[in-house]
């Protein structure tokens, strides 16, 4: 499955309800599983982003639907990056020879 890196920032509501952040992570894992996705790892971070989530999804459309659904809850916003594994990058590079 394609891999994604999500850079997460808390919105005001997410900060007000910070005590629930781990529970929200559990709920996100359950929702991802229902959608045929996998949250590989969650990290709460310091700096410009409050969290980094590594995910796998069957396709970009499913990933986009998940991100829109989570974002609509009002706790977080973020950026999603499509991440390429070594073998995928080798395939990409082979196309530019």
Spans of features found by a protein language model:
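A generic structural signal for alpha->beta connector loops
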Residues: 36-39, 75-77
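Residues forming the ATP-binding cleft of Hanks-type serine/threonine protein kinase domains
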Residues: 43
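Short S/T/G/P-rich N-terminal loop/turn motif that feeds into the first structured element of a domain
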Residues: 1-33, 38, 46-49, 61, ...
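An amphipathic, aromatic/His-enriched active-site/gating alpha helix that lines ligand/cofactor pockets
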Residues: 57-87
């Amino acid at each position: 499955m394609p891999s994604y890196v999500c850079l997460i920032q808390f919105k005001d509501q997410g900060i007000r309800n910070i005590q629930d952040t781990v529970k929200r992570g559990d709920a996100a894992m359950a929702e991802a599983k229902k959608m045929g996705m996998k949250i590989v790892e969650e990290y709460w971070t310091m700096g410009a982003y409050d969290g980094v989530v590594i995910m796998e999804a069957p396709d970009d459309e499913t990933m986009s639907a998940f991100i829109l659904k989570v974002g609509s809850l009002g706790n977080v916003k973020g950026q999603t990056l499509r991440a390429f594994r070594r073998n995928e990058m080798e395939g990409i590079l082979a196309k530019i020879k």
